[in-house]
Amino acid sequence: MRTLVVDHPLVAHKLTVLRDKNTPSPVFRQLTEELVTLLAYEATRDVRTEPVTIETPVSTTIGTAFTKPTPLVVPILRAGLGMLEGMTKLVPTAEVGFLGMARDEETLDIITYAERLPENLTDRQIFVLDPMLATGGTLREAIKFLFKRGASDVTCICLLAAPEGLAKLEEELSDANVTIVLASIDEKLNEKSYIVPGLGDAGDRLYGIAG
């Protein structure tokens, strides 16, 4: 597993505004989209391509195109949906799948309540969208779900991570071909498993408080 924190003034500025509790939902959504596009630029640095021959108005030349199948983008519901537009603006030909995951309040296990993905993910290059890597439980189960379908190349784009959750992922996925791309690794988790300083509940700030 590899971790990449994107160090760029625009990333730092947009993240600062996202963190501000006074930032309203419409601005929060717009900034999330913009920030994801910046992170996706780095996350797609190793996207698979092949040479293609094209005709310009002047001559024939060799260009670059995505290999087939094209990248698969998988937002984790619901907060991951707020990141989708920022990703597909950069990679508009990508296919999009969905994973709905939540923690069972009684058992505390992560359950999959919805999915719309190809049955066979062998040879697919997959980009998972999940804004907050707190305990790491949801992202870990999402990656395992994809691996069970045959995936072997997964990149996760997150806005923030707590060191505790990141360490747990590294421990369990140390040998896996997984890359985590982040805007920031924050200080810690608090007693409620919120990232500190964090930005609060990303889903609530994107869409309101409906669960």
Swiss-Prot record:
<feature type="binding site">
    <location>
        <position position="78"/>
    </location>
    <ligand>
        <name>5-phospho-alpha-D-ribose 1-diphosphate</name>
    </ligand>
</feature>
<dbReference type="GO" id="GO:0006223">
    <property type="term" value="P:uracil salvage"/>
</dbReference>
<dbReference type="GO" id="GO:0000287">
    <property type="term" value="F:magnesium ion binding"/>
</dbReference>
<feature type="binding site">
    <location>
        <position position="195"/>
    </location>
    <ligand>
        <name>uracil</name>
    </ligand>
</feature>
<protein>
    <recommendedName>
        <fullName>Uracil phosphoribosyltransferase</fullName>
        <ecNumber>2.4.2.9</ecNumber>
    </recommendedName>
</protein>
<dbReference type="GO" id="GO:0005525">
    <property type="term" value="F:GTP binding"/>
</dbReference>
<keyword id="KW-0460">Magnesium</keyword>
<keyword id="KW-0021">Allosteric enzyme</keyword>
<dbReference type="InterPro" id="IPR000836">
    <property type="entry name" value="PRibTrfase_dom"/>
</dbReference>
<dbReference type="InterPro" id="IPR034332">
    <property type="entry name" value="Upp_B"/>
</dbReference>
<dbReference type="GO" id="GO:0004845">
    <property type="term" value="F:uracil phosphoribosyltransferase activity"/>
</dbReference>
<comment type="pathway">
    <text>Pyrimidine metabolism; UMP biosynthesis via salvage pathway; UMP from uracil: step 1/1.</text>
</comment>
<dbReference type="GO" id="GO:0044206">
    <property type="term" value="P:UMP salvage"/>
</dbReference>
<keyword id="KW-0547">Nucleotide-binding</keyword>
<keyword id="KW-0328">Glycosyltransferase</keyword>
<dbReference type="InterPro" id="IPR029057">
    <property type="entry name" value="PRTase-like"/>
</dbReference>
<keyword id="KW-0808">Transferase</keyword>
<feature type="binding site">
    <location>
        <begin position="130"/>
        <end position="138"/>
    </location>
    <ligand>
        <name>5-phospho-alpha-D-ribose 1-diphosphate</name>
    </ligand>
</feature>
<feature type="binding site">
    <location>
        <position position="201"/>
    </location>
    <ligand>
        <name>5-phospho-alpha-D-ribose 1-diphosphate</name>
    </ligand>
</feature>
<comment type="function">
    <text>Catalyzes the conversion of uracil and 5-phospho-alpha-D-ribose 1-diphosphate (PRPP) to UMP and diphosphate.</text>
</comment>
<dbReference type="InterPro" id="IPR005765">
    <property type="entry name" value="Ura_phspho_trans"/>
</dbReference>
<feature type="binding site">
    <location>
        <begin position="200"/>
        <end position="202"/>
    </location>
    <ligand>
        <name>uracil</name>
    </ligand>
</feature>
<feature type="binding site">
    <location>
        <position position="103"/>
    </location>
    <ligand>
        <name>5-phospho-alpha-D-ribose 1-diphosphate</name>
    </ligand>
</feature>
<comment type="similarity">
    <text>Belongs to the UPRTase family.</text>
</comment>
<dbReference type="Pfam" id="PF14681">
    <property type="entry name" value="UPRTase"/>
</dbReference>
<dbReference type="InterPro" id="IPR050054">
    <property type="entry name" value="UPRTase/APRTase"/>
</dbReference>
<keyword id="KW-0342">GTP-binding</keyword>
